[in-house]
């Protein structure tokens, strides 16, 4: 090897190796101090790209796990509100069962309906005010997508439904609505109710006053109706004529009548104090004037004495040919029982409903007047109409009864099958709660899976970019030794040109 001064090849070689060991030492120290094998792309370009993708995935999945927890929180918030709605519905159902019991008074039903209304209003309040982070969860139908992955489309959808009184089918729910009015309701709920029921017996029409029961004819100018004392038939006559008995008349009978001749003959043939029978009546001879048959006879009718006077006798050789007869009282035969009476008429009794029924009268519609308005009731009295519209009894806020027509009642009517309506609402709430419960379990599963994935990805990234301390410490020790050796050798290499000077001595 040539001996030169200008170029110290050994020094240059030593310096180069010293630089290499310095670079190795710097790299080892950097890795040991950062804990990373890859601190820049130059350390491992491919590894750095792979590790960076892992980092993106890990951060995305970590955030996705937090998102899933938010999803659980949303579901729990919504389910908690639904639990309160369920509690209110259960109370409404309990009250509805109570309301359907027939023992409740009007005030009871009003109190029950008042609480039901408050419960329904609370359901609407919960629906309108329940929110999560400013998002209302029950006031409208909504699909909320929760990002549970690191990439597009990796979502779980929470199906939020509008849950309020209307959506539950309970809008206008009422257990104390107006009920169809009946004649009985009108009589019991209002004062000064008047009117009449109509009846028909053949071609004849009648009215029966709903308060007094008085029966009159169904006409513009009605007549009072009576029951014929003789035959029980309906009539407008207040009495029936009894039959006058010819034997007992206060006016003188025409001379020669059979009754006068018979009585005169009895007097003629008897003496005072004698009795005799004539036409089923027992007479006593009170006075006898002469032998011609003039005189007086008497009998007792209904506890009263009746005297017959016989006069104007015309006799033949053996018989009375003519006479006049005059009674002290007029006597009649009753049309009812054929008995003697002093009354020329028998009074007919005023007709009653039972008399109409006895004459096979058929009930028709009724006319009922309440507060000046005339309503029509059907034959059974369970339907009241005005101008063709069915009437209902309603209660004002102060509890006063009032009549409203079917149009007004439609908006306030009692709910048909209230328990079925509540059960349907409960089923809908249960379905939504069930869905939310299932989605919470799904989020729990997603969170567990995300945690496992993040753990595995961290392990994979660690294997790529984390420093192996055993290796790096070994590399650092090696580089330090090389540095020390290189420094020492460089000093010796720098002394080599001094050897050339020895040749010049």
UniProtKB/Swiss-Prot annotation:
> One GO term of the cellular component aspect?
extracellular region
Q: Where is the signal peptide?
A: none
**What InterPro entries has UniProt attached to this entry?**
Flagellin (IPR001492), Flagellin_C (IPR046358), Flagellin_C_sub2 (IPR042187), Flagellin_N (IPR001029)
Major location category of this protein? secreted
Q: Which UniProt keywords apply?
A: Bacterial flagellum, Secreted
Question: According to its UniProt record, where is this protein located?
Answer: Secreted; Bacterial flagellum
Q: Which GO terms describe its molecular function?
A: structural molecule activity
Question: What Gene3D superfamilies does the database record attribute to this sequence?
Answer: 6.10.280.190, f41 fragment of flagellin, C-terminal domain, f41 fragment of flagellin, middle domain, f41 fragment of flagellin, N-terminal domain, Flagellar export chaperone, C-terminal domain
What this protein is reported to do is described as: Flagellin is the subunit protein which polymerizes to form the filaments of bacterial flagella.
Family affiliation = Belongs to the bacterial flagellin family.
Q: What else is known?
A: Individual Salmonella serotypes usually alternate between the production of 2 antigenic forms of flagella, termed phase 1 and phase 2, each specified by separate structural genes.
This chain belongs to the protein called Flagellin
Organism for this UniProt entry: Salmonella moscow
